[in-house]
Amino acid sequence: MAATSTAAVDQLAADLGNTSLDNKAAAPAPIDTSAVPEAQAEGAEAAPTPTAAPHPQASASLYVGELDPSVTEAMLFELFSQIGSVASIRVCRDAVTRRSLGYAYVNYNTTADGEKALEELNYTLIKGRPCRIMWSQRDPALRKTGAGNIFIKNLDAAIDNKALHDTFAAFGNILSCKVAQDEHGNSKGYGFVHYETDEAASQAIKHVNGMLLNEKKVYVGHHIPKKDRQSKFEEMKANFTNVYVKNINNEVTDEEFRELFAKFGEVTSSSLARDQEGKSRGFGFVNFTTHEAAAQAVDELNGKDFRGQDLYVGRAQKKHEREEELRKSYEAARLEKANKYQGVNLYIKNLGDDVDDDKLRAMFSEYGPITSAKVMRDSLIEGSEEKDEKDKENKKEGETKEEEQNEGSEKKTEKKGDRKLGKSKGFGFVCFSNPDDATKAVTEMNQRMVDGKPLYVALAQRKDVRKSQLEASIQARNQLRMQQAAAQAGMPQQYMQAPVYYAGQQPGFMPAPGGRGVPFPQGGIVPGVQGGRPGQYPYQQGGRGGVPPQQMPPMGYPINQFGPGAFPPNTPQYMAAMGQVGALGGGRGGPAGRGPQGIPAGIPQGLQGGPAVPGYPPAGRPQNGGGRGTPRGNANFMAAGRGASPIPGAPADLSAGSFLQAQLATTQDPQAQKQIIGENLFPKIQAIQPALAGKITGMLLEMDNAELINLFEDDNALNVKVQEALAVYDEYLKTQGQQPTQQPAEANGEQPKAEEQKPEEQKA
């Protein structure tokens, strides 16, 4: 039986000898992998194909790799559910950015479904990219042993993952197969095949190494880990025999070049590089039989004058090795430069447009000697300037030709001077000679008002350092948010698990094992589900939205922690609903007295009867001897009798700027942050300029968030900004031929009309 099996493998290898994997060329008949020895053919059942061999593990978990970043759990569920019942799907994502890492895990209920998916769906195109499927191996030691893993190089560019898999599947069960690709999806010419056993890997190396695949001779060998390759490479470097020589006189012949090195030992080969015309390129190579001879030649000839030129003689290096050494030298120089300016280089932003290098230096010169000061500017586009210049010259019709030429030359001179300084980017750098001076400048200049703008001054940091700090802060904030949400939902933190995709459910969080763990919200609620149409959302009946136990709401609509149909605080729907509460009757017998039947829809259960925010008493409790209900007609219940805050909903013991910063910390979306600032800024501007509050708010929102937060602390600065916005708007109205807003209102007759209506309103 063993002899028959060996003969079958030899026959497969012979068939591989003329295999062509190029789709364009006419390929011979495919290899018949279903052939089995006669001894096995007499059995009751035939053995399964290598790729469909049953996995020894009882788990039915598959690893799906090489995925496009835009692939979601829903796309994978639609594909893998065609094979059988899917238990769960999870696309692995970055903990901070939530971007896909390019791989996922698919769990089936039975191992048979997993084997079928591995057989039929491997290398299936998903979003234009073939996926790679293998059994999930949770033990990292088994994944990294390298047993059964082979390396193939010199592959043709037409060979992809599937073609490589089909070629090597004849020798045994393949766990994983991959052709290395660049960022554009092109083959790098090498790949890896991981067999289940070492015997299968040895058979593949024995029969395929040195054979032609797509008319290219391939190399197949055992995979050597990078650590072992590095140690072997260091050993080769220490025992080099090949020498590189440059700075050679162009008149030196091959014989003279060889004789120069022959005195140090036996030379196996020597060569001078020449161009197409046969002229020397000034460098060459010499290979010795022993390392000692090569080392002696390097020691004695390096820097020696030969035919009027100093030679460079050193160990011959490959291109990737030279690039690596060059990269290391650049990295060392960069780190040395960064360490040199550590603690003395300051970053300043929120600068005015009129601040140049000299003015920036003058601002910080009082704190100590400055080595350099630079304001970053945009580069000017010459094409736009030349076009403007031509337009101006075409308008001068009454001037003489000489005058036009003279003026044109003068303007060109001015334009050339202007091109040296582009528009300021609003930030710059100041480098001190002493770290103590830099620290003092940061302490005294940070948040100082200069030209109506608060400066931001801090120590300059490299981009990678800033990115790592930002990721760490975002991750810590997300973790704190998850803990707070878990505490509100009454779920222990140890039951918090990563989001997965369940069959028959929507994306959410895995239920806690052995309990009824309640998932926590993911940053939003179902807006107005109770008032929606029947069947608008899953599990909705009779126009009332609900989620059955242990199930998840639709993607993008997490469970509403404020109650069914409720709105979160600080939204227009929330404020409108609270206004309805103020209009309800108060007292023990009023509609808002005891039960939630008198509360309008959209109010969180925790806020029925009063606001449940920090700094306010619990909802529904009597305050200062008052009744249980909300006073009748009190629409502005948040400020009545409790000490109004500059921002509605802010605690009395917290400043407006601090409260706003706390709100902005809940989101990283710039558009959402602007919306939060606008909602809080509009009431303050409306008190100053009611008629144009909306326009002025929109104009001020173009400012930096840090500057806007300062406006909440300084009413005078806010008034100045409002007046500046009004002035800009008046200039715009003048250009449109309309009446400015700052003119008296009596001119159009509106104010007298309003005064005439006042007595009537009072009588009514």
From Swiss-Prot:
Keyword Transmembrane in annotation: no
Task: Locate the compositionally biased regions of type Low complexity.
Answer: 597-613
Residue ranges, annotated region (Disordered):
36-56, 375-420, 587-634, 735-764
Q: Where is the composition biased (Polar residues)?
A: 735-745
Q: Give the main localization category.
A: cytoplasm
Which GO CC annotations does the UniProt entry carry? cytoplasmic stress granule; cytosol; nucleus; ribonucleoprotein complex
Top-level lineage group: Eukaryota
Name a biological process GO annotation. Answer: regulation of translation
Query: Is Repeat among this UniProt entry's keywords?
Result: yes
- The UniProt record lists the PABC domain at 657-734
Instruction: Supply the alphabetized keyword list.
Output: Cytoplasm, mRNA processing, mRNA transport, Nucleus, Repeat, RNA-binding, Translation regulation, Transport
Domain RRM per the UniProt entry, residue ranges: 60-138, 148-225, 241-318, 344-462
According to the UniProt entry, which residue ranges have a biased composition of type Gly residues?
587-596
Q: Give start-end positions of Basic and acidic residues composition bias.
A: 387-399, 408-420, 752-764
Query: Where found?
Result: Cytoplasm; Nucleus
The record's annotation in CDD domains points to: RRM1_I_PABPs (cd12378), RRM2_I_PABPs (cd12379), RRM3_I_PABPs (cd12380), RRM4_I_PABPs (cd12381)
Q: Give the Gene Ontology MF terms in alphabetical order.
A: mRNA 3'-UTR binding; poly(A) binding; poly(U) RNA binding
Function field: Binds the poly(A) tail of mRNA. Appears to be an important mediator of the multiple roles of the poly(A) tail in mRNA biogenesis, stability and translation. In the nucleus, involved in both mRNA cleavage and polyadenylation. Is also required for efficient mRNA export to the cytoplasm. Acts in concert with a poly(A)-specific nuclease (PAN) to affect poly(A) tail shortening, which may occur concomitantly with either nucleocytoplasmic mRNA transport or translational initiation.
Family per similarity comment: Belongs to the polyadenylate-binding protein type-1 family.
User: What's this protein's name?
Assistant: Polyadenylate-binding protein, cytoplasmic and nuclear
